[in-house]
Amino acid sequence: MKKIQGCAALIAAAALFFAAGCEKKRETVRAFALDTEISITTDAADKKIAEEAVAICRKYEKMFSRTDSESELCRLNGGEIKTPGSELKSLIETGLSFSRLTDGAFDITLAPLTDLWNIKERKIPPESSEIAAALRNTGYERVTLAPFSLGGTEIDLGAVAKGYIADRLRKYFNEQGVNNVICDLGGNVMLSGEYTVGIQSPFSEGELFAVMRLRYTNAVTSGAYQRYFEYNGVRYHHILDARTGSCAESDAASVTVVSPCAVNADALSTAIFILGTNGLELCSRFPDTDASVITKDGEYRTTEGFAEKYKLKIK
């Protein structure tokens, strides 16, 4: 495998600018938002537009964040407001559709379990009785949209929010007439232009497992190798299976989804990680959407035609 610097799950390795005939000077705007490091790379002349894109990220963070007590979602979960605004409601509806699609393996009502596991701080796994108690306060079927009701649950949009925001950013850049953009929202990558993108190995930090060529699309990777703790030789990670209330235990070590719709790619990367290689068939429900799975055994499984379509090369 080829050694690389950094540990992002997806790495835009090289930009190809055919329209201009040569590569222009580039600028990258970096910020901490959406509970992660984000970067937006554009031609240098478009730097101010990239800075405005960061402001757009922060606007949506005030809608969808679970860690900001003033966000619209936090106030909805806390009962301070009873009905979400149009964009929050739309994203909740999208999340519910994926919950139904996976028969509840993917579930946007896992806030109590997310809080219980608290991967950033926890050193030992919770007791089974604690997990059972948290599960009693979950269940996507309890949420209704008309009239709106959480049904005693709390919403966590962590598996769809960054994808939704990436779609909004693409719309913004298109409206501004800006091309040749890489938006990296912590592993959710929106590409406007043609790029070679690297997929990080889930087994060795800083190494590429594969590279692929992408054009005007989105790529999202989910894996268990960045946010986790270990206890008694067992790794406990942040991707939870709603059916068990515990860390997902499929055959997947890493999942990458490519789709023109970033919110679909975001949700599917999590859903397929939970379901494992059997979940690859979910991509057939969505136009021009493909996925690859690096299994725990080091095998590479993809949707049909993935390697040819994206000029995939295993390192």
Language model segments and positions:
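Mature catalytic core of soluble alpha/beta enzymes
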Residues: 2-315
